[in-house]
UniProtKB/Swiss-Prot annotation:
Protein name: L-seryl-tRNA(Sec) kinase
Catalytic activity: L-seryl-tRNA(Sec) + ATP = O-phospho-L-seryl-tRNA(Sec) + ADP
Record-stated family: Belongs to the L-seryl-tRNA(Sec) kinase family.
Enzyme Commission code(s) on record: 2.7.1.164
Molecular function, one GO term: L-seryl-tRNA(Sec) kinase activity
Disulphide-bonded residues: none
One Pfam family matching this protein: KTI12
Binding site for ATP: 8-15
Enzyme class: transferase
Function: Specifically phosphorylates seryl-tRNA(Sec) to O-phosphoseryl-tRNA(Sec), an activated intermediate for selenocysteine biosynthesis.
GN (gene name): pstK
Pathway: Aminoacyl-tRNA biosynthesis; selenocysteinyl-tRNA(Sec) biosynthesis; selenocysteinyl-tRNA(Sec) from L-seryl-tRNA(Sec) (archaeal/eukaryal route): step 1/2
GO terms (BP aspect): conversion of seryl-tRNAsec to selenocys-tRNAsec
Amino acid sequence: MRLLILTGPPGSGKTCFARELARELRQEGWRVAHVEADALRGFLWDEFDPKLEQVARELFLKSVETCLDAELDLVIADDTNYYSSMRRELALLALERKVPWGIVYLRTGLDTCLRRNRERGEPIPEEVVRRIYDRFEPPEPDRWWERATLVLDDSRVSEEVLEFVESGLRVEKPKKRRRRTDPSSVNEVDVRTRQVMGELMRRLSETGAATQELGRKLSELRREIVSSVEDPEKAVREFRRRAEEVIRECLHGDG
């Protein structure tokens, strides 16, 4: 069993890639599950609805989890996974089960993504493609969950891809660093992100925009940042940036 996490903006060719890879491996006798996020979204709406994206994501993660618990050789997690934290969620599902995982990043230009989106049967709004493209966080090998990443500039299933998958995608959570993380820096990340959180909630309260749901989402985001970013300055920048996106989406429905 192994987990292959696909990532790339809408229109990068992930689903075509996944289908071709699954077909080739099945011909060799592999038991492959292709978990296609867009197909799951099709059960939730007839036309793209950003308000249901969180529900779609939860359904996608649950489907991947179910497949990882089955007797299979490969699970392909096919979604944009445009934030690093989204790929981390999937890696943790594999790690919990002691299943090796790897990432295929389909690096694609915006013009190509927009053209392919227009050509697909049920295109998503162009502004959504542009927004996700602008927000996309490419995998970085210094993150333990992105250590085994294959970057492709086209969506062909090449010998390089097959070798990457068949090698076992051997990735383990890294050993503890020789230099332990300074506890004071961890505490500073917590304190400073709490300060930013308080500042944001005061601002929202003054404008009458503070809601319980928005507070919950910002709290979840802050906990995610605290658990994954060690540098206080970087943590504050990341939290501010992501928090503003969450606020815009909640207040204006930008999804």
